[in-house]
Amino acid sequence: MTTQPSVQSQIEGLLPAGGHVEVVAIVWATVDLDRVIAEMGLPAEALPDDKLLGAAVRLVRRPGADSIALLEPTTEGRLAATLAKSGEGPAGHYVRATDGLSSVIARATATGIGMKRANDGPFGPSALVLGGPAVGPHLIIVDRSAGTIDR
């Protein structure tokens, strides 16, 4: 996992001084999971659906690079809107804040930054940062204690 400055700057108001995030996976929007998995030529692991974005999720681990979470819409939600506007491709990030999801949500509440929380998701408990366009890019913060994060 790497820390990406652009992701870091998106959530600076949600982190304590000196806090940072680690990219768990790049969100990749697609209308056909099987086709994209075949094109990548790497194994893909089925993960629980992402209820925040309305999508089925497959995780592709790339040697020496960030993992990619391939998402295909299962509802007429945010991911479907992303695909309608921008087509297939990168659509955001799943990140882990070093001080945990609860701390991030508390700071968001205190500063008026909207978040939508899910108790389960592809990487465990998570929250979608609101305020940007519904079509993305999407930023989902996952809890540091989630058992599936070491991917």
Predicted regions, residues:
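Short Gly/Pro-enriched loop/turn and capping motifs at secondary-structure junctions
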Residues: 75-77, 99-101
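Amphipathic alpha-helical segments
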Residues: 29-46, 101-111
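A short, acidic/glycine-rich surface segment
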Residues: 8-10, 77-81
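Short glycine-enriched loop/turn motifs at secondary-structure junctions
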Residues: 19-22, 84-90
